[in-house]
Curated annotation (Swiss-Prot):
One of its GO terms (biological process) is fatty acid biosynthetic process. Component of the acetyl coenzyme A carboxylase (ACC) complex. Biotin carboxylase (BC) catalyzes the carboxylation of biotin on its carrier protein (BCCP) and then the CO(2) group is transferred by the transcarboxylase to acetyl-CoA to form malonyl-CoA. The lineage of its organism: Eukaryota, Viridiplantae, Streptophyta, Embryophyta, Tracheophyta. Belongs to the AccD/PCCB family. It comes from Draba nemorosa (Woodland whitlowgrass). Its EC number is 2.1.3.15. GO terms for cellular component: acetyl-CoA carboxylase complex; chloroplast stroma. The gene is accD. It is found in: Plastid, Chloroplast stroma. One of its GO terms (molecular function) is acetyl-CoA carboxylase activity. A zinc finger (C4-type) spans 229-248. It catalyses: N(6)-carboxybiotinyl-L-lysyl-[protein] + acetyl-CoA = N(6)-biotinyl-L-lysyl-[protein] + malonyl-CoA. Gene3D superfamilies: 2-enoyl-CoA Hydratase, Chain A, domain 1 (3.90.226.10). Binds 1 zinc ion per subunit. Its cofactor is Zn(2+). This is Acetyl-coenzyme A carboxylase carboxyl transferase subunit beta, chloroplastic.
Length: 489
């Protein structure tokens, strides 16, 4: 039987939850009153209730955070030593295989909830004798119904208390291999959106096991709210964190729409050439999937017509022309549509004397369009020459991860100021291509933004949080000011 430690800490209506699994209690922090008393309230799942009382419930309206169908994966044959915010300690014993559920006499918050749950969720919805508090025909002498009841009790308790910060310390082969955040879901299928809730995950388990675990399928169902770190595999609410992992600082990919929202003032974005789509100019043939089908599937996935969004807007009140590439659309590859949209954007910025920002995120030229995609490099570079040399206008290039191939070889490195995100992968040829061609190992980190900055290929590395302010100051330094000076931030 494994022993587990729960540390409940209440702060601003939020309970911080931490669990550790270990074979012995010696390795845990000081524990008060951890011995199990003889006088325990016992529920035998093959019999009846013992010790349940009638109390009103105040947990009826809480959101469900733990699914009852998953709770058995988390709790099976375990003793939990629990300490609440008042430092009161008590133990809970679950053994679903042997159909037993026991808690000691020092129940505190958990006892009250189980009392309340049984009286409100089960006893109030049936007829019974006023003198018979143990009679519960809803719970039959079958293993499945009893297990369901235990699951429901635990489920309902966790849905009102479970939170955040979970890490597993067990080296036991019997310890559960799943993270607690896999259970954070509701009956309506939506994850709780409260700003008081964050998820932090610490683990010393093998990362390959985590990557292969099916536990991470949660991001497929809730990717509009939550995003998973590629580096430490923790979950975070992406709207709050701007896709930056708060545990390891790893920068995750952002969509073009998210970057527009990051840089452009609300309500000022005016897109350009939204209806421009590729017509498969060279009739590219593929055995796996026709080019047109790939375009259609990428459009359905991203909601975009191609791998770049262009338009005008205001950045802290300063009118700007902005183009943002989207890596989710066929790897941000540059085809004829991408090249044409960027070219038209630069020409418009030239005519209107607007500062220009291009946010790069691309795998290079799109091979399905052959030499037409390669010609976009020359076309964009040509209009940039007129914009920068003839009109003396200001162009900022922002390189994100990854920026490679034809984009790096053309407009990506032509900015008057070249800014990169931290840890961005920036290269012409990828590491694998170089190693296969030259038969030499590429040093780790040699194609990262930090390495390029040391070699003078970049002007600055700017995190996402201050990026908008930095760009605004650069524009003002080059005599581009807000339309309304009160909008300066």
């Amino acid at each position: 039987m494994e022993k587990s430690w729960f540390n409940f800490m209440f702060s601003k209506g939020e309970l911080e939850y931490r669990s550790g699994l270990n074979k012995a209690m010696d390795s845990f922090a000081p524990i008060e009153k951890t011995t199990i008393k003889k006088d325990r309230f016992i529920y035998d799942m093959d019999k009846n209730f013992y010790g349940w009382g009638e109390r009103s419930s105040y947990y009826n309206n809480v959101d469900l955070l733990v699914s009852s169908k998953d709770i058995r994966n988390f709790i099976s044959d375990d003793t939990f030593f629990v300490r609440d915010s008042n430092k009161n300690s008590y133990s809970i014993y679950f053994d679903i295989k042997k159909n037993k559920f026991e808690i000691n006499n020092d129940l505190s918050d958990l006892e009250f909830f189980f009392y309340s749950y049984c009286s409100s969720s089960y006893l109030n919805n049936r007829s019974k004798s006023d003198n018979d508090l143990h009679y519960d025909p809803y719970v039959k002498n079958t293993k499945s119904n009893c297990n369901n009841h235990i699951n429901s009790c635990i489920d309902s308790y966790f849905r009102s208390h479970i939170c955040i910060d979970s890490y597993f310390l067990s080296d036991s082969t019997n310890s559960n291999e799943s993270y607690i955040y896999n259970f954070i879901c509701s009956e309506s299928g939506k994850i709780r959106e409260s700003k008081n809730y964050k998820i932090r995950t610490k683990t010393n388990r093998n990362r390959n096991n985590l990557m292969n675990s099916k536990d991470f399928d949660i991001t497929k169902n809730y990717n509009q709210l939550w995003i998973q770190c590629d580096n430490c595999y923790g979950l975070m609410y992406k709207k709050v964190e701007m896709n930056v992992c708060e545990e390891c600082g790893h920068y995750l990919k952002m969509t073009s729409s998210e970057r527009i929202e990051l840089l452009i003032d609300p309500g000022t974005w005016n897109p350009m050439d939204e209806d421009m789509v590729s017509a498969d100019p060279i009739k590219f043939h593929s055995r796996e999937e026709p080019y047109k089908n790939r375009i259609d599937s990428a459009q359905k996935k991203t909601g975009l017509t191609d791998a770049v969004q262009t338009g005008t807007g205001q950045l802290n009140g300063i009118p700007v022309a902005l183009g943002v590439m989207d890596f989710q659309f066929m790897g941000g590859s540059m085809g004829s549509v991408v090249g044409e949209k960027i070219t038209r954007l630069i020409e418009y910025a030239t005519n209107q004397c607007l500062p220009l920002i291009l946010v790069c995120s691309s795998g290079g030229a799109r091979m399905q369009e052959g030499s037409l995609s390669l010609m976009q490099m020359a076309k964009i570079s040509s209009v940039l020459c007129d914009y920068q040399s003839s009109k003396k206008l200001f162009y900022i290039s922002i390189l994100t991860s990854p920026t490679t191939g034809g984009v790096t070889a053309s407009f990506g490195m032509l900015g008057d100021i070249i800014i990169a995100e931290p840890y961005a992968y920036i290269a012409f040829a990828g590491k694998r291509v170089i190693e296969q061609t030259l038969k030499k190992a590429v040093p780790e980190g040699s194609q990262a933004a930090e390495s390029l900055l040391r070699k003078g290929l970049l002007d600055a590395i700017v995190p996402r949080n201050p990026l908008k302010g930095v760009v605004s100051e650069l524009f003002q330094l080059h005599a581009f000011f807000p339309l309304n000076k009160t909008e300066i931030k």
